[in-house]
Amino acid sequence: MRILEIFAILLILKEVRPQTKRSHKVNMKTPFQKRKNHHLNTDSRATLMSPADLHSVEHSIVQIRDPTLIPHYDQKSQEDMKLHFLKNTLVTCNDGTTAGYYLRETKGSKRWIIFLEGGWCCYSKETCGVRYDNVKRLMSSSNWPQTRKGTGILSPRQDENPYWWNVNAVFVPYCSSDVWSGNVSKTQDGYAFMGSVIIQEVIRDLVPRGMKQAKSVILAGSSAGGTGVLINIDRVAALVEETTSESVQVRGLVDSGWFLDSRHSKQSDCLDISKCALTEAIKKGLKLWNGILPENCKQQFKKGDEWRCFYGPRLFTSMKSPIFVVQWLYDQEQLRIENIQTEFQSMTENQWNSIQNIGREFKKSLREVPAVFAPACLSHTLITKSNWLEFQVKSVTLAKALHCWDRSLQENRAPKGVIRGCPFHLVDNCQWPHCNPTCPAIYDATSGQELSILQMFLKLRLESQRRGQEPKGDLGPLMSMLRNSG
């Protein structure tokens, strides 16, 4: 019977696999795998993993799949975003160099997108030292390129970015290592943590460049930048309204920054973030950074528990500004925080079941959020990917959902005012990782070949049988879900 079952699966693969074909493949190998053949001190393209014994600290540092991180050496054009340093030179990166932003202005436009870069954080002398040695650009502006290309929602190309290609686009590089919350000019170890102040100064510098006449401002961010949006959006809204001459709508776009409380906890002193709870790193960091958190959120917790305001589900209930949450249901960073690896050759039964539980927890946490785009995929960050239009939930792209949300806010002035035929609360219904046929491709770590969801499951199942284990669930529901595409 077992042989017949496997044979049946292989027959079905011929039917299902074409659904996963795509013109642009997103490599899902871990950053560590990609980095094996590269020198560690490459600032222009930092990875999430660090060398040898400190690999897990560095793993937490930065996303590598953001094309805007690559210096652009072609002939300068009007499509490039150009570097501007802050006028207030006292507002600095970790190492004391002046912070700044990249700007592409569009004449006549009164719409603005301000994007906060991600890249995790450092929270002690040791972790900040590792970060500075390996990804200096996340702590210093000294080697920033003069221009960047905008991609995804920052792209000036209408075919790549149909609704926001002609807005004023701002990219704020992350060089404060404090999840955009810090407010200290120099610690005893010599580092500045001024993320929250940098955002405020960027807004002030943009006022004479046209923001004074703004009608719409979106504060967006990915990963740590997305968490930075959650933490800062209400203060940004107040500052924008104070400095603009007309009525302006300010809203937030949170990409892969909606983290859940980790179920893992370690009481011992933690220098390596993979060996301790995320909450321990945040607690340490909050003190080091003199972090500024929203007062409305802090009031919900007793003294000493303010760190809970770094988590989206905790923070959302006290927010005033409308936000749109973009969140992979099987976010790779959340899985890493939970000590779950996604290499199917070595995954255990418990890890497989834990991955499914994470998806259910994300769904539950997003129920009361009016504007959501949550595909059932294994990935991390989305809005600045050049192929962001490929991904869909219930046959709706993220760009379309954002446009519907934008229209709803303009026409109804209320976050729950849904326009008929224009949905913007989109959460996949299917129950398995990567059950959405538009998910980014997954590749076999050994062969490099792309895997369909059924091949992935079969690989896991065969490996589990070899170990005398069996992932819970049968293939019938999985096949049905694949045919219905969530």
Swiss-Prot record:
GO MF annotations in UniProt: palmitoleyl hydrolase activity
Keywords, comma-separated and alphabetical: Glycoprotein, Hydrolase, Secreted, Serine esterase, Signal, Wnt signaling pathway
Superkingdom assignment: Eukaryota
GO biological process: negative regulation of canonical Wnt signaling pathway; Wnt signaling pathway
Localization annotation: Secreted
Residues spanning the signal sequence: 1-18
Entry-linked Pfam families: PAE
Principal EC category: hydrolase
GO cellular component: extracellular region
Catalytic activity: [Wnt protein]-O-(9Z)-hexadecenoyl-L-serine + H2O = [Wnt protein]-L-serine + (9Z)-hexadecenoate + H(+)
EC number assigned by the record: 3.1.1.98
PANTHER family: CARBOXYLESTERASE NOTUM2, NOTUM-RELATED
Physiological role: Carboxylesterase that acts as a key negative regulator of the Wnt signaling pathway by specifically mediating depalmitoleoylation of WNT proteins. Serine palmitoleoylation of WNT proteins is required for efficient binding to frizzled receptors.
Descriptive protein name: Palmitoleoyl-protein carboxylesterase notum2
Species for this entry: Xenopus laevis (African clawed frog)
Highest classification ranks of the organism: Eukaryota, Metazoa, Chordata, Craniata, Vertebrata
Gene: notum2
